[in-house]
Structures are given as C-alpha cells and as structure tokens.
Amino acid sequence: VEYRLGRTTGIPLAVVTGSPLQSLAYLDLHADTQDQKGNTVAFIGKMGAGKTMAEKRLCAAIAARGGRIIATDNSDEREWVTFVNSIDGVRRQIVDTAHPKLSLDPLRILPPEMAGQVAQSFLLTLLNLETIGVAGTTLAKVLKPAYMRDHQITSCGRLARHLAEECDLPEATAIADRIAVFADIENSASLASAIFDPDLPPADLSADILIIGTCGIALPNAEEMLSEHLFRQLPPHKVFGRALYALIARLARLVCFSDRARDAAFIVDEFHHMSSSPEASHAIDEYVRESRRANAWLITGSHDPEADYPNETVRNLIQHRIVLLCDNINLAQKGVEFLGVDPKTSPEEFADLVKIALNPGGPGCGLYADQHGNVGEIRLLRPAYAPHREAASSNPPEHDQETA
C-alpha cells in the first residue's frame, strides 16, 4: 500500500489516509496528457458509498477552471440538475428526456457538416437498418449536407416528411414509415418529443454545462440483446432508449472535443446504462482512445467493474480507479482486481485490500489506484463550498468526509 498517490498539483481528490502525514492526492489532466496517460476516472462502490458526491465535486472543479461538462442524470430526483444549478457563473442547459423542454434532434442542434453523420448513426440504430443495405444507403444520401440544404431538411421531422412525400430514392417511404413508429408519442412516450417535437427549442451545445436527464429510459437486457427472436420483439421505447444512449455518447465526444484549448469532461454515473448499448459502448471506446489529445476527461460511476465495463479497451485505459464501499465479498474481490492487484501473485495484499473494500471506514473512504498503478487508502474530499456541498448530497449528510 502506497503513501504517495496521484499528482502533486491539480484538482484535490482525496486525503491519503494510509500516509502518516495525511497527504493529498490530486488529479491533473494536463500532466496525464503530457505523460501519455489516459484521462479516465472510475468510481466503484455500492449505492451511498460516495461515488456521485465525488463526481459532482470534480464537475464543479472543472467548471471553475473554465472547463465544459456534459453529464447524464439517471436519478428520479434530478440530483444533477439540483447540483449544477448551485454552480455560479456558468451557462447551463438541461435536457430532461422524461419531460422535454429542449430538443436533442441532431439535425437541429448540430452544424450541417456534422448533423447528417450523427443523425445517420442515430437513425441506423433506431430503425435497425444495415449501413450498406438499400434503406441504409438511401438514408446516407439524404443526410449529406448538400442534399439536406437543397431539400431544406433541417430536422428529423422534416426528414421524415421528405422521405414520405418528396423522395424518389429506393425504400424512402419504408424508412419514413419506420420513423413514424418512433415519432409517435403513444409508442415512444416522451422520447419521441425529445427528438421529433418541432415546437421544442433546440438544446445549445455551446453551454458550459449540459445535463441530459435519462431517468426512465428503458434499455434491452442482456438476454434480449443476445437473442435474435427477443430482439426483434423489443418494444419501441427500448429500441429508442438504446439509440438515444448512443446519441448522447456521440454528442459528448463532439462537445468535449470541440475546443482542445479548453478542458472538458463527460460524466456518466450508473455507467451500466451507457455500456449496455453496444453502439454507445463503441462511441465511448472512440472517446477514450482520443480523449488524451483533446484534453477531455471521462468520469464514470459503477457498482460492478466487471459487468459495467465489458469493453476491454475502455477498461484498460482507465488510469484512475477508486474502489469505495462494496456490499459483498464478490464485488469487493472484483473491485480489488480492478485496482490491478492479482490474487494469485499477491494473495496476502489482495486479501488485505478486500477487507478494506468491505469496510473502508465510511462514505468516501476506500482504495485508489493512481496513474502509475500505485494503490493506497484514501478518503475522498467533499466540496468545501457549502452551497455545492449541500446541493451535491444525494444521501443523508456524510459527516465523516473532509472538504476541499
């Protein structure tokens, strides 16, 4: 177990409790970039262990340094909305897919040179079309910037009308019929409005902080994804959820990579929702591979590192790994292995760390494997600014975490 962890400058992350001097561990995006390290942070632990508090604190710290944030909010209470409303001096946008007041239609929120490609990816997933099939080829043609300009296609709704009434390309009306299924609020509920309602103003992706509420979005389970029969019978709202998570991941890449002179972070609590969509997982893979060159973070929260990070590329590129309270021996063992400790080559250290993971000392306490693979005991810092601390609390007050 190490006494010195993390960086010596940057954003204060935690007190290294294993150190006699109670030193601080810092996260430093620019130092990681210069050292050719990845920019991914993963918090592992049971509900109430302190993951979300830490994610929100990093959000505020990055925003205070002039960075940009895009985050998902899967909570019933809209806890991320509450938190970002406590951050002063930033432009924020809230897109709540359960009660949409802003549109996420890629043809409305992105410039024409990007919009068609992102919309094509979204619609291929939503409509379950093959990229090089007849319908997929038609979709690619009508979403080219010049074609959209010539035919005044400025929204997904307008695209559907064009395909249904004005387009002579093969299978155009069949594509329009498929879109109509998902654009029907009786089939897709509020998700239909979030993309296809022309009366909603478009979300502003240039905002300093963009929160996308994902509460209530249903996704296919593992059995449905693996069974062709069950997959074909998926209800529209589950198909829509799968496509929407992939769209969010692609939007995050565009937002966070848009200005390489400015730090940015994509924050995903409850990461299993994102990784359960194969298309979203692929987009996350691309994000992680390229994030170092763009000065962009990926910050995630998870209960189970083995199940929630099935993409080996993403898992191997996570440089900062924090394991907090685990509620059973199986998850504690997975957590310690996730830290890089091998139970076969280091059985005594492994057993000792599993005991810590099962009883780390309270919310925010746990183990940290830093960018060099050093592992030590820590206590995560809570926000020092009282309004942030109060707004960040998604549980009863945690009196045993320090602030900074």
Report each predicted region and the residues it spans.
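P-loop NTPase motor domains
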Residues: 1-24, 74, 85, 102-289, ...
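Basic- and hydrophobic-enriched, low-structure N-terminal and domain-boundary segments
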Residues: 1-39, 383-385, 395-404
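Conserved P-loop NTPase motor cores
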Residues: 30-61, 70-79, 98, 227-349, ...
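Conserved SF1/SF2 helicase motif Ia
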Residues: 65-67
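Conserved beta-strand scaffold positions in the cores of enzyme catalytic domains, especially
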Residues: 69-71, 89-94, 209-211, 321-323
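P-loop NTPase switch/communication element
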Residues: 76-106
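Short conserved micro-motifs at the rims of enzyme active sites and ligand-binding pockets
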Residues: 104-107, 221-225, 333-335, 379-381, ...
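Conserved P-loop NTPase
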Residues: 344-399
